Amino acid sequence: MTDIELAYAKTFSGASGQRVLAHLRQITIERVLGANATESELRSLESQRMLVHQIETLVSRGRGE
Protein backbone atom coordinates (compact mmCIF):
# COMPACT_ATOMS: atom_id res chain seq x y z
CA MET A 1 0.00 0.00 0.00
CA THR A 2 1.45 3.34 -1.05
CA ASP A 3 1.00 6.80 0.39
CA ILE A 4 -1.13 7.85 -2.59
CA GLU A 5 -3.43 4.85 -2.13
CA LEU A 6 -3.90 5.80 1.52
CA ALA A 7 -4.60 9.39 0.50
CA TYR A 8 -7.29 8.27 -1.95
CA ALA A 9 -8.88 6.02 0.68
CA LYS A 10 -8.88 8.86 3.20
CA THR A 11 -10.28 11.36 0.70
CA PHE A 12 -13.19 9.15 -0.32
CA SER A 13 -13.90 7.42 3.02
CA GLY A 14 -16.53 9.78 4.41
CA ALA A 15 -20.14 10.26 3.37
CA SER A 16 -19.27 13.15 1.05
CA GLY A 17 -16.48 11.18 -0.61
CA GLN A 18 -18.77 8.20 -1.15
CA ARG A 19 -21.40 10.51 -2.61
CA VAL A 20 -18.86 12.00 -5.03
CA LEU A 21 -17.68 8.53 -6.11
CA ALA A 22 -21.27 7.41 -6.65
CA HIS A 23 -21.93 10.50 -8.76
CA LEU A 24 -18.77 9.98 -10.83
CA ARG A 25 -19.78 6.36 -11.40
CA GLN A 26 -23.29 7.41 -12.42
CA ILE A 27 -22.14 9.97 -15.00
CA THR A 28 -19.41 7.76 -16.49
CA ILE A 29 -19.48 4.01 -15.90
CA GLU A 30 -23.27 3.70 -15.76
CA ARG A 31 -23.86 6.12 -18.65
CA VAL A 32 -25.10 4.63 -21.91
CA LEU A 33 -24.60 6.40 -25.21
CA GLY A 34 -27.10 5.94 -27.99
CA ALA A 35 -26.56 4.15 -31.26
CA ASN A 36 -25.76 7.46 -32.95
CA ALA A 37 -22.77 8.24 -30.71
CA THR A 38 -19.72 9.34 -32.62
CA GLU A 39 -16.33 7.71 -32.28
CA SER A 40 -15.11 10.84 -30.52
CA GLU A 41 -17.93 10.64 -27.96
CA LEU A 42 -17.21 6.96 -27.34
CA ARG A 43 -13.50 7.59 -26.86
CA SER A 44 -14.15 10.51 -24.52
CA LEU A 45 -16.57 8.53 -22.36
CA GLU A 46 -14.20 5.56 -22.23
CA SER A 47 -11.39 7.83 -21.02
CA GLN A 48 -13.66 9.19 -18.29
CA ARG A 49 -14.64 5.64 -17.28
CA MET A 50 -11.00 4.62 -17.05
CA LEU A 51 -10.25 7.56 -14.75
CA VAL A 52 -13.15 6.72 -12.41
CA HIS A 53 -12.07 3.08 -12.40
CA GLN A 54 -8.52 4.14 -11.49
CA ILE A 55 -9.84 6.24 -8.60
CA GLU A 56 -11.95 3.33 -7.34
CA THR A 57 -8.97 0.99 -7.60
CA LEU A 58 -6.72 3.32 -5.60
CA VAL A 59 -9.42 3.75 -2.94
CA SER A 60 -9.78 -0.04 -2.64
CA ARG A 61 -6.04 -0.56 -2.37
CA GLY A 62 -5.81 2.17 0.26
CA ARG A 63 -8.47 0.36 2.28
CA GLY A 64 -6.51 -2.87 2.00
CA GLU A 65 -9.16 -4.60 -0.10
Language model features: what each stretch is:
Residues M1-E65:
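Intrinsic-disorder/low-complexity detector
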